[in-house]
């Protein structure tokens, strides 16, 4: 894989406006329009709590996964918020980073 074809986004916020009006919109358009071949989102900090507790955000996550975007989450963050099993059950790779 050419590193110039891969986008990594570190998602740290629990602000829903940022998720829907920037992150999700950009990654889905990037994938659909071929701006990047490989898109990876890393959930870090408070973002894991938001994803675990908000069904609207979970629906958006599933759409991203179905479009071929990879999503990973920091295992330590998930454990700190007590959401590791929820995040894993969404199909997100949870690992130490």
Task: Show the residue positions of the predicted features.
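C-terminal structural segments of small proteins and small subunits
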Residues: 86-97
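Short, glycine-/small-residue-enriched flexible loop/hinge segments at domain edges that mediate gating
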Residues: 33-51
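A glycine-rich helix N-cap at a beta->alpha junction
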Residues: 55-84
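Short, glycine/charged-enriched secondary-structure capping and boundary segments
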Residues: 23-24, 55-58, 87-89
């Amino acid at each position: 894989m050419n590193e110039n074809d891969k986008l990594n986004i570190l998602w740290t916020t629990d602000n829903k406006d940022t998720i829907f009006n920037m992150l999700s919109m950009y990654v889905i358009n990037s994938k659909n329009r071929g701006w990047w071949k490989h898109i990876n989102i890393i959930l870090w900090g408070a973002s894991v709590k938001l994803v675990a507790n908000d069904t609207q955000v979970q629906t958006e996550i599933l759409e991203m996964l179905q479009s071929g975007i990879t999503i990973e989450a920091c295992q330590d963050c998930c454990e700190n918020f007590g959401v590791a099993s929820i995040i894993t059950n969404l199909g997100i790779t949870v690992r130490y980073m």
